[in-house]
A protein has these predicted regions:
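A short acidic, glycine-rich active-site loop
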Residues: 228-232, 348-356, 476-482, 535-546
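Carbohydrate-interacting/catalytic domains
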Residues: 1-170, 175, 187-201, 480-489, ...
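Flexible loop/turn segments at secondary-structure boundaries
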Residues: 213-215, 260-265, 325, 331-335, ...
């Protein structure tokens, strides 16, 4: 095996920071050694097996909690009328640990319980930090822990899929995945949505909002119980059945995991758990997120790192999760959370503004995940562009497999919002879509859930606006909708075809789902109208949504069958005057004419020799185009010219209709 080069060797601009990079690496290596048992980090991370409620070998119950500021802790619940009693008092074990052992008959499947924690000067009800099941009372809205011990444990039937070097990700939210105005379930998703994902050809499911969160409208980002699967979507067995069904179809399941902060709630969450504000969090202002109103973890504490690392291990062990998208990584990495600042140079990544404790934790998390399952993968959501974040740890990086290419979606919005079609720059589009570090892998997307949220707009809605409500019928004649349909397909195709190493689509955007996402809240009368997916729009032949879906399926199929992400895109033509962008990738040529009015006959450009066949065009009638191109058209480039080169000037000539993209494959 060839020696792995350090990131400052592959990027000379990082050489001034060699000492910092090496120091980080050594520090993290030392932490790994301290947390490991032998050479195994996995063997050393087991807090979830010690704390919380578990069975003992003699079939009793044991419950443990870490609360160093507590003076007394009681188990309260249906079994003792929710009253503190000595029979249910935990005994101190030292080092802040507390324990109680109960006979089998005291607790059973479905029993509701909480903790009552007393501390100097006060006390309150709390949910266990390592609780794995919580339920909400429909009347009081209060959450309780629930004993979960079904008579028959779930039996896994299917093996996890293999490695995903180039994931094609379908981002989804279980609760808003149904058509009815209510919270949808795991079982409904497995039955109704998973087959759609498989039919489209996506090979990875990225699921949001799995960790329990008190406020549904937070989109799952205000987590209270990190080990608890959100019960509003169903039972643990129903989620396992969903994961199992995805694996049966060869689809990996990635979890959107929130380790960047915790909800400020005290009754449900970790805030002031034992009366101290800094149990798992930073003390003072640093422990409170100024923009999110939540608590910020102190990643320098061993207890915090053990808690979060155990959380990763738990989800992989218990639910066979194949990987994680780490949310809010920028907020974790910087003391100011990256708020209202521009990242303009490498100094931003290697100076006092970085929370090195967070870097340590993220590197350890990646090591743990990789040791548990070498085929698992991780994705970082980071807007700062920190160098090395998605580089291997051995190379001096943090170890993520991929980073989200977040600037691409922002740029599409900017171009649509601020420029006329005639002002679009082919050079700018090419640069923004392909600009990435050579040593790091990226996931590209034209839009994700962020662009669909209330207050923002999806691409299709920006392109069509109010005419989406009146002119999406096939018989309607609307230049605005025609433009929107054409650009929606072109934008997605060019984004996928230039993607660094993977591609993401948010649920429903493949067919141009109308309107925005707005979860039930006081401001909208607690309505679910905009917190659902109207799948039926993509079914009738008389609506144009169906044809956008058909194109997305064909596009994903092309990317997989041609293996385009195995190669690096190569620019062939960047024609600013005519608004034409042409590039090659793997065995394909992608030619896009963004010109709003002009079509070009016999547009010539240099291309590799061989026979080229048209395999996909956005203008096809089956994709609601105008049918101006002939499917399966063949073009031939001679093998060599007089000078022996395998390219000719103006050697391939195409008809490029306005607002159209075509994919050619070399036979």
């Amino acid at each position: 095996m060839s020696e792995i080069k350090k990131i400052y060797e592959t990027d000379p601009w990082l050489m001034p920071y060699k000492e910092v990079i090496d120091s980080r690496h050594e520090r993290i290596e030392a932490l790994k050694a301290r947390y490991s048992v032998g050479d195994s980090l996995v063997k050393g991370i087991n807090n979830h097996l010690y704390y919380g409620l578990h069975r003992t070998p003699d079939h009793k119950w044991v419950f443990r909690e870490w609360a160093p500021n507590a003076t007394r802790i009681y188990l309260i619940g249906e079994f003792n009328n929710w009253k503190r009693s000595e029979a249910y008092a935990l005994r101190p074990l030292g080092c802040g640990n507390w324990e109680i052992v109960l006979d089998d008959l005291f607790l059973s499947h479905g029993t509701l319980y909480k903790l009552f924690i007393e501390w100097p000067g006060g006390g309150a009800e709390r949910l266990p930090a390592y609780v794995t099941r919580t339920v909400q009372d429909p009347e009081t809205k209060a959450f309780c822990a629930e004993v979960w011990e079904p008579e028959k444990p779930y039996r896994w039937r299917h093996r996890r899929p293999g490695k995903r070097p180039h994931p094609l990700i379908y981002e989804c939210h279980i609760g808003m995945s149904g058509e009815e105005e209510r919270v949808s379930t795991f079982a409904e998703f497995r039955k109704n949505v998973l087959p759609k994902v498989a039919d489209l050809g996506y090979d990875t499911l990225q699921i949001m909002a799995l960790q329990e969160h008190p406020y549904y409208g937070s989109f799952g980002y205000q987590v209270s119980n990190f080990f608890a699967l959100s019960s509003r979507f169903g039972t643990p067995e129903e989620f396992k059945a969903l994961v199992d069904a995805a694996h049966a179809r060869g689809i990996a399941v990635v979890m959107d995991i929130v380790h960047s902060h915790s909800v400020d709630n005290e009754a449900e969450g970790l805030s002031l758990f034992d009366g101290r504000e800094d149990l798992y969090f930073y003390k003072g202002p640093q422990g409170r997120h100024p923009a999110w109103g939540s608590r910020c973890f102190d990643y320098g504490k061993d207890e915090t790192k053990y808690f979060l690392l155990s959380n990763c291990k738990y989800w992989m062990e218990e639910y066979h999760i194949d990987g994680f998208r780490f949310d809010g990584v920028t907020s974790m990495l910087y003391w100011d959370h990256g708020l209202e600042r521009a990242f303009t140079g490498y100094d931003d990544y290697f100076n006092g503004s970085v929370d090195e404790n967070a870097v340590d934790y993220l590197a350890l998390a990646n090591m743990l995940i990789r040791e548990m399952n070498p085929d698992a993968f991780t994705i970082a959501e980071d807007v700062s562009g920190m160098a090395g974040l998605a580089a291997p740890f051995a190379a001096g990086g943090v170890g993520f497999d991929f980073r989200m290419a977040m600037g691409i979606a922002d740029n599409w919005i900017k171009w649509i919002k601020t420029l006329s079609d005639e002002q679009w720059s082919m050079g700018e589009i090419w640069w923004q879509l392909t600009n990435k570090r050579a040593d790091e892998k990226t996931i590209s997307y034209a839009e994700c859930h962020d662009q669909a949220m209330v207050g923002d707009k999806t691409i299709i809605f920006r392109l069509m606006d109010a005419q989406m409500y009146t002119s999406m019928n096939k018989d309607s004649k609307s230049p605005v909708v025609d433009r929107g349909i054409a650009l929606h397909k072109m934008i997605r195709l060019v984004t996928l075809a230039t993607a660094g190493d993977g591609y993401l689509n948010f649920m429903g955007n493949e067919f141009g789902h109308p309107e925005w996402i707005d979860f039930p809240r006081e401001g909208n009368g607690w309505s679910y109208k905009y917190a659902r997916r109207q799948w039926s729009l993509a079914e009738p032949d008389y609506l144009r949504y169906k044809y956008l879906r058909n194109f997305d399926k064909a596009m994903i199929g092309m990317a997989k069958s041609e293996g385009i992400l195995d190669d690096t895109p190569e620019l062939l033509v960047q024609d600013e005057e005519k608004k034409i962008l042409i590039f090659r990738r793997k065995n394909c040529i992608f030619a896009a004419n963004f010109n709003p009015t002009e079509s070009f006959v016999d547009y010539g450009f240099a291309a590799p020799a061989g026979k080229w066949v048209d395999i996909l065009t956005t203008d096809s009638l089956e994709f609601d185009g105008f049918g101006r191109l002939t499917n399966d058209a063949h073009f031939t480039v001679p093998q060599k010219n007089a000078n022996g080169n395998d390219r000719y000037e103006d050697s391939l000539f195409l008809y490029l209709p306005s607002r159209c993209a075509v994919v050619l494959r070399r036979e």
